[in-house]
């Protein structure tokens, strides 16, 4: 036997085993993929028509609530913007009423604070300094 013939046989056996490994790997991956598809579809298939209808109703109700909320926000935003424009537009009556209104609020705030009795903290006793003129002695 030639040593070259042995190497050729080894190469052929390695090549075929590599091909077989690749084939087996591809088959295994395909089976795993098919199992994943079955698992994903099995949940939907196991659910009854009533359950599917219930979930669809929940989804529709949620979408309708979102739409209602959005329309409510849009409508109130328009009203708010109108009120804001009115408040920002200076008028003679507004200026007079706002100044008297502010004065009334200050008066009310002062009267409320006077009515409340809270904790009274006494400060440290203050020392009074008495200065006497220094007399110089006649010496």
Swiss-Prot record:
Query: Signal peptide location in the record?
Result: none
Q: Which UniProt keywords apply?
A: Chromosome, Nucleus, Telomere
| Pfam family of the protein (one) | FAM192A_Fyv6_N
- Disulphide-bridged cysteine pairs: none
Q: Name one GO cellular component term.
A: nucleus
Q: Where is the composition biased (Basic residues)?
A: 113-139
Region annotation (Disordered) maps to 83-139
Q: State the compartments where it is located.
A: Nucleus; Chromosome, Telomere
The record's InterPro entries line, in alphabetical order, gives: FAM192A/Fyv6_N
**Composition bias, Polar residues:** 90-101
Q: Which family does it belong to?
A: Belongs to the FYV6 family.
Role description: Involved in telomere length regulation and promotes fully efficient non-homologous end-joining (NHEJ) by a mechanism activated in postdiauxic/stationary phase.
What this protein is called in its record is Protein FYV6
What organism is the protein native to? Eremothecium gossypii (strain ATCC 10895 / CBS 109.51 / FGSC 9923 / NRRL Y-1056)
This chain is encoded by the gene named FYV6
């Amino acid at each position: 036997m030639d040593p070259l013939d042995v190497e050729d046989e080894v190469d052929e056996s390695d090549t075929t085993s590599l091909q077989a490994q690749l084939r087996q790997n591809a088959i295994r991956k395909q089976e795993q993929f098919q199992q994943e598809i079955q698992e994903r579809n099995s949940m939907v298939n196991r659910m009854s028509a009533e359950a599917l209808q219930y979930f669809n109703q929940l989804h529709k109700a949620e979408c309708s609530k979102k739409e209602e909320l959005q329309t409510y926000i849009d409508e109130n935003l328009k009203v708010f913007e109108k009120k804001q424009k009115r408040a920002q537009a200076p008028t003679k009556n507004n200026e007079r009423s706002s100044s008297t209104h502010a004065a009334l609020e200050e008066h009310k705030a002062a009267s409320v604070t006077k009515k409340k009795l809270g904790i009274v903290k006494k400060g440290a006793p203050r020392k009074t300094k008495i200065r006497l003129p220094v007399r110089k002695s006649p010496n």
